[in-house]
Amino acid sequence: SRCSAGAASANDPAKRYVRFVDAQTGEPRRLAYGAALFDFEPRNVITPHAHRHMASAHLVVDGRLRVRNYDRVRDDGDAIVIRPTRDAVFEVGVVSTMSSERDNVHWFVPQRGRATTFDVVISDLDAGQPPYEIRALDPLAATPLADGTLRAPVIGFAEASARYTADV
């Protein structure tokens, strides 16, 4: 459906609501979403981790962050096969997104001081599955494969926090 995005005037854009439906039944689905600010002190890190059943966007609103992304190619026992897609420093106004199809693994480290991101997360994307799943990975200990992908071991979050510091 359509409705005005503010006071009615010729300059107002049309706003369309997005409704998600179940692919099998056509019934409307309710998704969970949230927005948050992540305030990084110079030593804070979001360690490398993979996702399921969710999508997110991370807008840098203050400072600078080194952002490393990987596509999730496949699960392989106690590891996840990943493909590097990005390793860049993001400044204010730059956004990193994540979904099942693209840049599913991310890793954020502040650069030269504090940083803040404004994040929007949507979960419950896969009907009949848990709302979300997050698994810590160890890309630095990954085994390179012949096709250019990396077999990264799944590790616990305590181990990831100890290994992946602001100096890595």
Question: Which residues make up each language-model segment?
Answer:
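Long hydrophobic alpha-helical segments typical of transmembrane helices together
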Residues: L137-V168
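Short acidic-glycine-tyrosine-enriched beta hairpin
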Residues: R30-A32, A57, R72-H106, P110
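N-terminal leader/capping segments at the start of a protein or of a new domain
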Residues: S1-G6
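Short conserved micro-motifs at the rims of enzyme active sites and ligand-binding pockets
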Residues: V109-P110, G128-E133
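A short glycine-rich, His/Asp/Glu-containing loop-to-beta-strand
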Residues: A10-P42
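Conserved short histidine dyad/triad with adjacent acidic residue
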Residues: A36-H51, V89-V92, S99-N104, V121-S123
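Glycine- and acidic-residue-biased ligand/ion/polar-headgroup-sensing regions
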Residues: H53-R72
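A short hydrophobic beta-strand segment most commonly corresponding to one strand
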Residues: A57-L59, R112-A127
